[in-house]
């Protein structure tokens, strides 16, 4: 059986993200008492991912299912390995497309987080 996968190992793509991020700690004072509070805001950005491996499961009836092992690309290298089915990987998401989607989602849903895939 000849099985062709849609994406190769090393394929990179971008996904939109919108979530709460703690941006600063405020020091509050009242009548001699002091305490801190973490302040968060919703941020929108694009995250790059890379395919590291491919898993193909062939069933007894001759059908098959393809999943991809994917890692996030960060400034520190790669992290957070996850498995995704083929249909959950976007074909041509550029950083600009993912960023625009994230910003649009944040504008339309100001209190909701979105993690793409």
Show where each model-derived region lies.
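Mixed-charge, Lys/Arg-rich low-complexity intrinsically disordered regions
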Residues: 1-12, 19-22
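Aromatic side chains
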Residues: 7, 13-14, 64, 68
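Short regulatory "switch" loops immediately downstream of catalytic or recognition motifs
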Residues: 15-26, 71-72
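Intrinsically disordered, low-complexity, charged/polar segments
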Residues: 44-47, 52-117
């Amino acid at each position: 059986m000849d099985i062709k996968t849609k994406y190769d190992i090393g394929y990179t793509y971008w996904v939109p993200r919108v979530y709460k991020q703690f941006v600063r700690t405020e020091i509050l004072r009242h009548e001699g008492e002091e305490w801190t509070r973490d302040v968060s805001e919703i941020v929108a950005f694009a995250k790059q991912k890379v395919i590291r491996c491919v898993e193909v499961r062939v069933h007894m009836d001759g059908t098959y299912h393809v999943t991809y092992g994917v890692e996030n690309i960060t400034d520190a290298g790669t992290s957070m390995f996850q498995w995704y089915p083929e249909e959950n990987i976007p074909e041509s998401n550029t950083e600009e497309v993912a960023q625009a989607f994230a910003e649009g989602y944040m504008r339309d849903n100001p209190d909701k987080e979105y993690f793409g895939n």
